């Protein structure tokens, strides 16, 4: 599916301060090969392809403009054989991607405003959509649920991105209109659609609820907290954000204000990977 060049996916960079950091991490050219990038020969799983096709099919069917959907920005993998585009909501700073080591993946705990904890269970080798209903997980094979189930992306008032699995049959007791679910990737590679979790709620930290950063002010306290999140992310993923991704690409490390407020800075950085002379991503606005 190829979108026309005239596509304008309205971006929310300026209203989501941590989205800049998320996009930088997404652009990182990993040495371990655990993130799908322009040089990767692996293709996204069939589940993700199904999600993408359904997303754009729904967009066309409903006659919605791009800026009226949950797709706030579109990421294009250059040199991809299928020239796929992936919705990436910049309202939700999705940077805590998992290491693709084919080991059992840690459940991510998401904190709802109602103080309801929901875990995203990522199990080794699990290729089925999972739906939580009355503490039971109903696994459905993809090919069996295409006709009877639909996937929708929605956002709640906290700007946490939710993925809902809704049944077209109202009498189906396993209909999930509040619970999140995921589609795992066979190769434990990351999908920008599903694998990138929110910086504000994506870490498996049971001792502390990480604060949402939509309202971060550039105070010393909040700057220190953002630094803590970055350090936590680096320890968790074994990847360096500032040293590896930014300082090697630029003459100087950007200030926190540049990091969180400058859309132009982000787009310039996104345009070219200065270490490889590649242009791995194209951000459409």
Curated annotation (Swiss-Prot):
GO cellular component, one term: cytoplasm
Top-level taxon in the UniProt lineage: Eukaryota
Keyword Ribosomal protein: no
Keywords assigned: Cytoplasm, Meiosis, Nucleus
Single Gene Ontology BP annotation: meiotic cell cycle
Main location, first listed in the record: cytoplasm
UniProt KW Cytoplasm keyword: yes
Cell compartments where the protein resides: Cytoplasm; Nucleus
Function summary: Has a role in meiosis.
Protein name from the UniProt record: Meiotically up-regulated gene 125 protein
Organism annotation: Schizosaccharomyces pombe (strain 972 / ATCC 24843) (Fission yeast)
């Amino acid at each position: 599916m190829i979108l026309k060049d005239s596509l304008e996916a309205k971006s929310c960079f300026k209203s989501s301060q941590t989205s800049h950091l998320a996009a930088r991490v997404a652009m990182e050219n990993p040495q371990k090969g655990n993130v799908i990038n322009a040089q990767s020969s692996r293709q996204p799983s069939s589940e993700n392809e199904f999600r993408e096709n359904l997303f754009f099919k729904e967009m066309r069917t409903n006659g919605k403009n791009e800026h009226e959907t949950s797709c706030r920005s579109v990421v294009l993998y250059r040199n991809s054989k299928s020239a796929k585009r992936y919705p990436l909501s910049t309202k939700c700073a999705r940077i805590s991607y998992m290491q693709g080591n084919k080991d059992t993946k840690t459940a991510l705990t998401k904190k709802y405003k109602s103080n309801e904890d929901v875990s995203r269970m990522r199990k080794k080798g699990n290729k089925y959509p999972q739906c939580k209903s009355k503490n039971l997980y109903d696994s459905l094979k993809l090919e069996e649920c295409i006709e009877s189930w639909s996937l929708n992306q929605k956002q709640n008032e906290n700007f946490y991105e939710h993925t809902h699995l809704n049944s077209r049959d109202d009498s189906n007791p396993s209909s999930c209109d509040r619970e999140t679910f995921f589609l795992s990737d066979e190769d434990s590679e990351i999908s920008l659609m599903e694998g990138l979790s929110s910086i504000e709620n994506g870490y498996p930290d049971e001792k502390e609820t990480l604060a949402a950063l939509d309202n971060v002010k550039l105070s010393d306290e909040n700057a220190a907290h953002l630094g803590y999140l970055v350090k936590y992310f680096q320890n968790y993923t074994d990847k360096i954000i500032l040293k590896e991704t930014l300082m090697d690409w630029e003459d100087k490390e950007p200030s926190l204000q540049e990091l969180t407020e400058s859309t132009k800075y982000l787009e310039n950085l996104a345009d070219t990977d200065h270490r490889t002379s590649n242009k791995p991503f194209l951000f459409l606005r």
